[in-house]
Amino acid sequence: MNLSRRDFMKANAALAAASVAGLIIPVKNVNAADTSITWDKAVCRFCGTGCAVLVGTKDGRVVASQGDPDAEVNRGLNCIKGYFLPKIMYGKDRLTHPMLRMKNGQYDKEGEFTPVTWDFAFKTMAEKFKSALKAKGPNGVGMFTSGQSTIFEGVAKSKLFKAGLLSNNIDPNARHCMASAAVAFVRTFGIDEPMGCYDDIEHADAFVLWGSNMAEMHPILWSRISDRRLANPDTVSVNVLSTFEHRSFELADLGILLKPQSDLAILNYIANYLIENNAINREFIEKHTKFKRGETDIGYGLRPQDPREQIAKNVKTAGKMYDSSFEEFKKLVAPYTLEKAHEISGVPKEQLEKLAKLYADPNKKVVSYWTMGINQHTRGVWANHLIYNIHLLTGKISLPGCGPFSLTGQPSACGTAREVGTFIHRLPADLVVTKPEHRKIAEKIWKLPEGLISDKLGFHAVAQSRALKDGKMQVLWQMCNNNMQAGPNINEETYPGWRNPDNFIVVSDPYPTVSALSADLILPTAMWVEKEGAYGNAERRTQFWRQQVKAPGEAKSDLWQLVEFSKYFTTDEVWPAEILAKNPAYQGKTLYEVLYLNGQVNQYSNDELKGRLNDEAYHFGFYIQKGLFEEYASFGRGHGHDLADFDTYHKARGLRWPVVDGKETLWRYREGYDPYVKAGEGVSFYGQADKRAVILAVPYEPPAEVPDREYDLWLTTGRILEHWHTGSMTRRVPELHRSFPNNLVWMNPNDAKKRGLKHGDKIKVISRRGEITSYIDTRGRNKCPEGLIYTTFFDAGQLANKLILDATDPISKETDFKKCAVKVVKA
């Protein structure tokens, strides 16, 4: 049989899309085989796509799952990880009791992990918290939390720390992945999160992936893009930019390999091209945008004594923006010619020009997608801005099939970390602790005395590790993440603080992760459908699920842990005496009483459960999830962050906010789609006081570390399809573990040959901060250009993040996991 090139491409891409999406599951057979299985809806535990699943339970266990055919997001499909969701809960080493390091019947930093009661664990924790608060103040204690926590848990922990302990020292691991996107959204539009939705996929003519391997990281969305591309081969294109070739290149019409950090130059070149070729939408620009110029030479978020910080001119004003004009913007991007962009990026000129023409074509609807390649970047905020610039200059924004779209990597990085506000500076609905009027709103809604919430920021993720090491912080509670494996520069900056004898580290986790085994107290955690939950995905969709099975042994949900722990503090112990003197009704109350028995959180009866499982509600005596949600939702209703009522979400397959009069919003800021845009306005970026979005001029600046004679290779890190983050769940699924049991290092064959290496050799990867032992792959799914290697961080036996420099974006404080210098030698 003869196949044309087009037919071959279509067949190959369809096969790739099917395998990536995990379309090997005869889900209908599950129902047919066993009618005694009880099915209920839930949300996938993994990435930020927000796929809906049907969960099958029998005899108190989750025994099956399948894609929910009624869900708009995934339309009945699951990726390979989603298919094996039931097995993440039943690893043989599941934790079932609190475990405290003890010797001779007492806590000892060098002791052995010993089972203790919850009461003993909490009394020990409370003693350490109170001691640290007294010695170091509010930032003496802290929490490192997660974009995997449920919305209810996010509200509970934000209240416990910010309103109870009066400490803003709580930050999520979303700092490592979404902070740059969030900061740039707010700086540009005045409101966080994308204006578009997944429906853009079925409307777009072109997809541009900036630093995103959607084929493996967002496979269900990739299956939709593949379907769109293959059904319209003459009109729809896929364009992929990356520092190495990955599976998304298999479908790409234009695959671009660029040098690390050079995305800044390419994006500025495109802006220059649009202006020089009169391909800008002048009417849109004049009506709906304003120009600003960013501060430059802002450093790399390293320790102040680092020489790179010492020579940077504007470290203290890194986030400052200055009023500007179109003419100044034009002048500032003018140096980014085709020649200069080629010189900096190494990308062939014809490819750069083809990409620029794609954005310039007034008849092409373009969606730009990006993930960690843009966000995990020492200039990640800038890179986000530069993508927005292109869409604002062309007016290709807030329309079906047109817009910039930052994809999230965790199931509720949006819904919990960003919308609830579990960052050191945030409160719900884009409010911030640094603004007095915002604190007053929170105090009123939470029924707290005026002036209680602090304006003092806590330590961001990387700074928490430094503070523990430096003795500025003494207690850390890590919840729903594995930062000892996932964080940067763990040998030099994280581990020393955790094992400092003056510090006390608590880890809440279902499994004995690298973090848990490095802690002093491990709290066993209920996971996924062992609790009632809610997530918010990348397209602003809020989705609920009910508890469907009970957790094993003494394992308790994070929500239970947070609320129960609040009983061990009184206001007299942690609130200022002057505030209590003015508000005597709060004196002597426990934090549990003032935060969770405030007449709002506890107003809903457990009768509403109608006998359904809900361990937390029955323990506390009221429908706590509903109370927390309704209190939280009141922050955003009427302010562009409207959420539907609690009961609606249990009936629906999720709704995209703002939800006004029962109707979700698909495209924000555009008349006819967004209820907050008035008739006749056309477009209104209403998050800004003047309703104008910012077009920001910022330059290319080099990375914090580059290869040299000794460390002669770039290292970039990321994930693979089969595993998620640090593998603490997926490596306990036998099928996923067998499919990819250990980490590898992908290298160009020529680089391997120069070093006397070949495919399969055992090697050492060495940076200025540490080394790992691994195996080389020169033939696999990832194809690296000469001078760059790629590896992952899922393997606890190869702690790849020992190698990573803890440089951050000075504005967002997000870590750059994509660029550092290493050398490779035979082991």
Curated annotation (Swiss-Prot):
This is Periplasmic nitrate reductase. Component of the periplasmic nitrate reductase NapAB complex composed of NapA and NapB. Pfam families: Molybdop_Fe4S4 (PF04879), Molybdopterin (PF00384), Molydop_binding (PF01568). The lineage of its organism: Bacteria, Pseudomonadati, Pseudomonadota, Gammaproteobacteria, Pasteurellales. It comes from the Bacteria. Catalytic subunit of the periplasmic nitrate reductase complex NapAB. Receives electrons from NapB and catalyzes the reduction of nitrate to nitrite. SMART domains: Molybdop_Fe4S4. The keyword Cell cycle does not apply. GO terms for biological process: cellular respiration; Mo-molybdopterin cofactor biosynthetic process; nitrate assimilation. It comes from Histophilus somni (strain 129Pt) (Haemophilus somnus). It is found in: Periplasm. One of its GO terms (cellular component) is nitrate reductase complex. [4Fe-4S] cluster binds at residues 44, 47, 51, 79. Keywords: 4Fe-4S, Electron transport, Iron, Iron-sulfur, Metal-binding, Molybdenum, Nitrate assimilation, Oxidoreductase, Periplasm, Signal, Transport. The gene is napA. It is an enzyme of class 1 (oxidoreductase). Substrate binds at residue 793. Residues 1-32 form the signal peptide. Predicted to be exported by the Tat system. The position of the signal peptide cleavage has not been experimentally proven. Belongs to the prokaryotic molybdopterin-containing oxidoreductase family. NasA/NapA/NarB subfamily. It catalyses: 2 Fe(II)-[cytochrome] + nitrate + 2 H(+) = 2 Fe(III)-[cytochrome] + nitrite + H2O.
